[in-house]
């Protein structure tokens, strides 16, 4: 309770390392919130989610937002990721370290023969890494950050995230 602001809901079975969960946030069972992660006001975190060290999940109060960030069940959010402005990370998606997602961040699926663009939603089971694309400005061409969907979650991805499951199953605190 030291790291939880009054008015936040944290379900039984949640592992909360030194981190912060703000007012109105909802964190469902079996979730791990690792060291120095922040869950913003009214953010919704599903079951068995892993928020790695230093993750920032935005809230709706500062700056004022109409929709909360939603991280659906069984998602994995890698170290130092930032997810803000009402972005939705759907079920079993994996965000690699340092992915930054805002409401206006281009999310580009590069798994097909032609890129497919999204904004505001990471589709289920997507594996996402930081990327960039070239954009022309009056002063020239510059690389702009984006998020790249490079595949779908596979058994090998599950093995990389399975330590969390083992710790939960055997009720081991880290």
Task: For the regions a language model picked out, list residue spans one by one.
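Cysteine-centered iron-sulfur cluster-binding motifs in ferredoxin-type domains/subunits
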Residues: 7-10, 38-45, 71
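Glycine-rich and polybasic anion-binding loops at the starts of cofactor/ligand-binding domains
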Residues: 30
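Glycine- and Gly-Pro-enriched alpha-helical subdomains that act as flexible
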Residues: 34-43, 51-57
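Glycine-rich hexapeptide-repeat left-handed beta-helix
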Residues: 47, 51-174
């Amino acid at each position: 309770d030291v790291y939880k602001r009054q008015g936040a809901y944290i379900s039984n079975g949640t592992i909360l390392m030194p981190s912060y969960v703000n007012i109105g946030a909802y964190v469902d069972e079996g979730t791990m919130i690792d060291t120095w992660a922040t869950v913003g006001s009214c953010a919704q975190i599903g079951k068995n989610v892993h928020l790695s060290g230093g993750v920032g999940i935005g809230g709706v109060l500062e700056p004022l937002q109409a929709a909360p960030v939603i991280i659906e069940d069984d998602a994995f959010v890698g170290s130092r990721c930032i997810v803000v402005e009402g972005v939705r990370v759907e079920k079993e998606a994996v965000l690699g370290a340092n992915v930054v997602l805002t409401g206006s961040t281009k999310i580009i699926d590069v798994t097909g023969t032609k890129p497919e663009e999204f904004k505001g939603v990471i589709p289920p089971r997507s594996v996402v890494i930081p990327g960039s694309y070239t954009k022309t400005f009056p002063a020239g061409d510059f690389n702009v950050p984006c998020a790249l969907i490079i595949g779908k979650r596979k058994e090998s991805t599950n093995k990389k995230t399975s330590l969390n499951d083992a710790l939960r199953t055997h009720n081991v605190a880290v």
